[in-house]
Amino acid sequence: RESGCSFVLALMQKHRRRERRFGRDMETIGFAVYEVPRELVGQPALHLKRDFFLANASRARSEQFINLREVSTRFRLPPGEYVVVPSTFEPNKEGDFVLRFFSEKRAGTQELDDQIQANLPDEQVLSAEEIDENFKALFRQLAGEDLEISVRELQTILNRITSKHKDLRTKGFSMESCRSMVNLMDRDGNGKLGLVEFNILWNRIRNYLAIFRKFDLDKSGSMSAYEMRMAIESAGFKLNKKLYELIITRYSEPDLAVDFDNFVCCLVRLETMFRFFKTLDTDLDGVVTFDLFKWLQLTMFA
């Protein structure tokens, strides 16, 4: 009698008939099975990094990578915890799939996902007196006589800046996206950005530009879903799969790429909301309670 546990893995591509109407053929797919290290067994939110896969060989894999709708293989492995990694043969290909698992004996399965968290450095908030004189001069030039940046002025400033960076794909910052940024950064509630508020936003955008360029791996001037995930993690955020899907749905263009203006709006909102939540979570239990007025004030204003 064979020793070990017998099971069948099947990986199926979804929506291929719909994709074929747009000229997209079947992707070349397959999967690999890795044993979970003893010290990580039982962890509910296991996340294996790139170094793990470089240092550990797979215990089993599909017989081949092939451009069929479904790939399936029967395996027999010793009892233990394993991670199944489905993939396309070529890296960074987008696609929906179903992974099915059939076993002779009862076995538990779960989808691995990240816990939501943000590792953000303390934001340096300078007083007006501490801000660099060159920046003050720039601010006075941009803000005009009232020394406040309005929504329209912010739109003009950002679009003037991005137009000088020919490597960035953008349709320009819309009035709505600029209004959202002003509302998120406006601490005194007057609907405009003063010197200190604009200084914070300016520093954030400079940081986001560096992250965008670093993770625009194909130099397309935009972010694919794969690049977007790495960029968001580099900015200090850990999100789960559902939130990543919502971000791509909310901020991507019809080709599922995220332009620079949408990338900035996304990260400004993420960082502001995480910092806002942290301020309200005084007992650090990860739960904040709002009354209806506070909830409407927060959601409608942002």
Curated annotation (Swiss-Prot):
Reactions it catalyzes: Broad endopeptidase specificity
Sequence segments annotated as region (Linker): 115-130
Cofactor note: Binds 4 Ca(2+) ions.
Cross-referenced Pfam families: Calpain_III, EF-hand_8
CC annotations in GO: cytosol; plasma membrane
An example molecular function term from Gene Ontology annotations: calcium ion binding
Tagged with keyword Transferase: no
EC number: 3.4.22.52
Family: Belongs to the peptidase C2 family.
Record note on quaternary structure: Forms a heterodimer with a small (regulatory) subunit CAPNS1.
Protein's job: Calcium-regulated non-lysosomal thiol-protease which catalyzes limited proteolysis of substrates involved in cytoskeletal remodeling and signal transduction. Proteolytically cleaves CTBP1. Cleaves and activates caspase-7 (CASP7).
Protein name: Calpain-1 catalytic subunit
Protein species of origin: Oryctolagus cuniculus
